């Protein structure tokens, strides 16, 4: 019997252990996509307690707690921090088999140093007190934890209308060497069907000093904000394409679509597709000219529980996987961007693992001469951000493309404790390659495979995003 979560956790061959301990373990973290609040990094936020850093805003945990029958007041409601933590501690023993069980105990190990102790109602007091004592120390502030975890770069997720004042404040602080850069997330500018679209156009017009009436005006406003983001070091964009659409339109049609929507009219699905296509093609060309990377997160079915959405809003754990086809529309969108050689470096993520091979083969259609891995099949996202999901994504990437050129893991998280997800990923990567060696499917060449592991853990992302590190 193998003990739970030792230093060799998941490393079930000698070759895997060598790969992890000698090549993967000490690689820095390049966290190119996350949802950390830049204000907390700028202020070097001190966390009030373990709830504040661990449960607040974590829809993964809330979802598990609801499944365990926990009342909503103990998830997102008015219960005290300690009551909410106790409800989580009572849920954790029921999460065996869920990635939350592994994540929880990896996060207690690093950075808190708690080993050999499982979170449950019987250990809740001890763990609560021990972690809270550590959180009062300087090296457990927001920046302190990032430094402990050997982070070199984080890319936050930011709206085109954001001031980026906190990124500017961080950049001016020469004592803090971790790069904290904005990522451009323009969803509200192309989701023309949303009720909030008109208000957003007014805000975008205000911050860009542009009167947005025609499609060319929208392009002008977005270009000004792209310049603003570039001035703050942005090299990355991200888009939630819950449904991939493609339909072409001429400028007169786009002007009409925008004008009628701004006048309060409801558009047809075809008109929505025309508008979104035009915005994404325009933005893709801008990214290509600037040397940016674009990310497409595809296939979420959001806000399924309308009653809870009305009470609590979005992003609180009521989303799931869509099964709408997307291969043809995605192919047309990428091909359109590529027509004039203005398809930027692109990372594609799918929420439905059924689509792994769709993306794994799609990226091979649009690779770039002289640019290894220009098109990327992104790491297992959201519901696939677990052992089986990561293994499937990497296996299918290896079978259909070049695993050695993969840009690796990202946290996609709102928590400063999520950096152990990079450790989890690295252990799974080394386990997988170690098993290939054990089965005679890959050579037992530690230099060849060790260098490949180092590249996937850090070097590939550093080179791909072309961000100069401190």
Curated annotation (Swiss-Prot):
Catalytically driven reaction(s): D-glucuronate = D-fructuronate; aldehydo-D-galacturonate = keto-D-tagaturonate
Q: What does the record give under GO molecular function? A: glucuronate isomerase activity
Looking up InterPro entries in the UniProt record yields: Metal_Hydrolase, Uronate_isomerase
Q: Which UniProt keywords apply?
A: Isomerase
Instruction: Please indicate if the UniProt record lists Aminoacyl-tRNA synthetase as a keyword.
Output: no
Q: EC number(s) of the enzyme?
A: 5.3.1.12
Biological processes, Gene Ontology terms: D-galacturonate catabolic process; D-glucuronate catabolic process
Q: Which domain of life is it from?
A: Bacteria
Say if the entry is tagged with keyword Iron-sulfur: no
Q: Which residues cross the membrane?
A: none
Query: Which pathway does this chain act in?
Result: Carbohydrate metabolism; pentose and glucuronate interconversion
Per its UniProt entry, what is the enzyme's top EC class, as one word? Answer: isomerase
Family annotation (PANTHER family): URONATE ISOMERASE
Which protein family is it in? Belongs to the metallo-dependent hydrolases superfamily. Uronate isomerase family.
Q: What is the name of this protein?
A: Uronate isomerase
């Amino acid at each position: 019997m193998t003990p739970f979560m030792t230093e060799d956790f998941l490393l079930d061959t000698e070759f895997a252990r060598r790969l992890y301990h000698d090549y993967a373990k000490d690689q820095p973290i390049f966290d190119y996509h996350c949802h950390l609040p830049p204000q907390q990094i700028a202020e070097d936020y001190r966390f009030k307690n373990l709830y504040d850093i661990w449960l607040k805003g974590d829809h993964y945990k809330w979802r598990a707690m609801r499944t365990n029958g926990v009342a909503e007041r103990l998830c997102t409601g008015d219960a005290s921090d300690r009551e909410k933590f106790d409800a989580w501690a009572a849920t954790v023993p029921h999460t065996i088999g869920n990635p939350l069980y592994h994540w929880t105990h990896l996060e207690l190990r690093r950075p808190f140093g708690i080993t050999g102790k499982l979170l449950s109602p019987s250990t809740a007091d001890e763990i609560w007190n021990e972690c809270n004592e550590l959180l009062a120390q300087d090296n457990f502030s927001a920046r302190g934890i990032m430094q402990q975890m050997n982070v070199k770069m984080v890319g936050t997720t930011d709206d085109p209308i954001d001031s980026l004042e906190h990124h500017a404040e961080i950049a001016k602080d020469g004592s803090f060497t971790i790069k904290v850069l904005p990522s451009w997330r323009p969803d509200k500018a192309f989701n023309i069907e949303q009720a909030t679209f008109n208000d957003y156009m007014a805000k975008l017009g205000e911050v860009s000093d542009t009167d947005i009436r025609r499609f060319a005006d929208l392009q002008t406003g977005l270009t000004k904000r792209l310049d603003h983001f570039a001035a703050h070091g942005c090299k990355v964009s991200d888009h939630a394409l819950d449904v991939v659409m493609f339909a072409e339109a001429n400028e007169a049609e786009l002007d009409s679509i925008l004008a009628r929507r701004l006048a309060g009219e409801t558009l047809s699905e075809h008109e929505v597709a025309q508008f979104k296509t035009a915005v994404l093609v325009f933005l893709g060309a801008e990214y290509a000219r600037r040397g940016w990377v674009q990310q497409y997160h595809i296939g979420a079915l959001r806000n399924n529980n309308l009653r809870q959405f009305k009470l609590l809003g979005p992003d609180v754990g009521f989303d799931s996987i869509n099964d709408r086809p997307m291969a043809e529309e995605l192919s047309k969108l990428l091909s359109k961007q590529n027509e004039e050689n203005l398809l930027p470096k692109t990372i594609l993520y799918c929420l439905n693992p059924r689509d792994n091979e769709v993306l794994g083969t799609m990226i091979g259609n649009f690779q770039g001469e002289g640019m290894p891995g220009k098109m990327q099949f992104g790491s297992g996202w959201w519901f696939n951000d677990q052992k089986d999901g990561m293994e499937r994504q990497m296996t299918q990437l290896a079978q259909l493309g070049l695993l050695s050129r993969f840009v690796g893991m990202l946290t996609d998280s709102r928590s400063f404790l999520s950096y152990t997800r990079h450790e989890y990923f690295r252990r799974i990567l080394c386990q997988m390659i170690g098993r290939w060696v054990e089965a005679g499917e890959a050579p037992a060449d530690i230099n060849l495979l060790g260098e490949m592991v180092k590249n996937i853990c850090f070097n590939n992302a550093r080179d791909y995003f072309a961000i100069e590190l401190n």
